[in-house]
Every structure is written in structure tokens, then in C-alpha cells.
Amino acid sequence: MIGKEVTLQDFTLELSELQPEVQPVDLFCEEELPAEHQETEEEPAIDRTPYKVVAPCGCCEVKLRIFVKATDFGIRTLQNLLIEELQLLCPECRGNCKHGGS
């Protein structure tokens, strides 16, 4: 390189040195793609069982019935909520309560 500015004549590319390392890649390889129906994994159907839940009203203690379809985990979670955190209200007691706890 002579001078302060670089010119293309100052660079010499030796592509023959890279030839052994660089190999062409066949883009049409022997890999087979699965069919579309095999490509999408179907989620297993969730097994839900119908249940009748009987719980007392949180105010007047009258028996209330609700019917749900739930998984084993879901029905156990509902049971824990009804025992510890949640109280159902009958229609009569609902009218006497203020919504939102205020």
C-alpha cells in the first residue's frame, strides 16, 4: 500500500486458499417433512366430569346446589375455595348484600 488512501489495487484476494474449507451445501437434502396433519400436535382432550355441589348459603345457611363440569384438580380446588375462602349466597341474601364489599 502506497499513499494515504486505500485503493482496490492494494488488496489481493486469494480464494484458492479457502476452496478446501468452503463446501457447497445441497439445499435439496434427503430430509422429508411430515404431512400437515402430523405437523400439528393435538392437545389431549381434557377429561371433565359433571358434579353436583351442595354448599350452605353464607348468610342464612340454606342448602344451595350448583352443577359443574370439572377436572379432578378443578373440583378439589373448588372444594378448598368453598371451605376456606368463598361463600355462596342464595338469591334472597344476595339482595341484602352490597356488591364489591362496599
UniProtKB/Swiss-Prot annotation:
Q: Where is this motif: Nuclear export signal?
A: 75-83
Cite the InterPro entries for this sequence. Papilloma_E7
Q: State one molecular function term (GO).
A: zinc ion binding
Swiss-Prot/TrEMBL GO biological process terms: DNA-templated transcription; symbiont-mediated perturbation of host cell cycle G1/S transition checkpoint; symbiont-mediated suppression of host innate immune response; symbiont-mediated suppression of host type I interferon-mediated signaling pathway
Residue ranges annotated as motif LXCXE motif: 27-31
Q: Where in the cell is it found?
A: Host cytoplasm; Host nucleus
Q: Does the keyword Methyltransferase apply?
A: no
Q: Which UniProt keywords apply?
A: Activator, DNA-binding, Early protein, G1/S host cell cycle checkpoint dysregulation by virus, Host cytoplasm, Host nucleus, Host-virus interaction, Inhibition of host innate immune response by virus, Inhibition of host interferon signaling pathway by virus, Interferon antiviral system evasion, Metal-binding, Modulation of host cell cycle by virus, Oncogene, Transcription, Transcription regulation, Viral immunoevasion, Zinc, Zinc-finger
User: What Pfam families does the record point to?
Assistant: E7
Q: Where is this region: E7 terminal domain?
A: 1-49
PTM statement from Swiss-Prot or TrEMBL: Highly phosphorylated.
Question: What Gene Ontology terms describe where this protein resides (cellular component)?
Answer: host cell cytoplasm; host cell nucleus
Please give the positions of the paired cysteines in each disulfide bond: none
Function of this protein? Plays a role in viral genome replication by driving entry of quiescent cells into the cell cycle. Stimulation of progression from G1 to S phase allows the virus to efficiently use the cellular DNA replicating machinery to achieve viral genome replication. E7 protein has both transforming and trans-activating activities. Induces the disassembly of the E2F1 transcription factor from RB1, with subsequent transcriptional activation of E2F1-regulated S-phase genes. Interferes with host histone deacetylation mediated by HDAC1 and HDAC2, leading to transcription activation.
> What binding partners and quaternary form does the record give?
Homodimer. Homooligomer. Interacts with host RB1; this interaction induces dissociation of RB1-E2F1 complex thereby disrupting RB1 activity. Interacts with host EP300; this interaction represses EP300 transcriptional activity. Interacts with protein E2; this interaction inhibits E7 oncogenic activity. Interacts with host TMEM173/STING; this interaction impairs the ability of TMEM173/STING to sense cytosolic DNA and promote the production of type I interferon (IFN-alpha and IFN-beta).
State the name under which the record lists this protein. Protein E7
Q: Which species expresses this protein natively?
A: Human papillomavirus 25
Which gene underlies this protein?
E7
